[in-house]
């Protein structure tokens, strides 16, 4: 699904599908920021005492996914709270596949997709609030997931 080209794509046209199936076009929430999409493969270092070379072997270890942060203005919806409440209540079906689509400049095509498999909210923060402030009231959501797929 990725659409390669010579010139890099801009970062500001993206859609987030929270995986609850309630959106008419697949997107349940607009976010201002989405950061830290990533994965790593850990490495275990190992060496026998009788090795000929004075170096360690690097053995492929476990896969790890980074926690993703989503930020948006407060819109008065309790959908994210309901999802978090399901998770903290121990509901086993509360895990979702969250999909992030990067779009081209004129919003006519998805050029890259990241799928966060078995995702769950692990942190929700609202604020800050300031009586003299003029900024938008914000909320921040942190997602943990078990596997990342890219298309």
Where are the regions that the model predicts?
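Glycine-rich, low-complexity intrinsically disordered segments
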Residues: 1-151
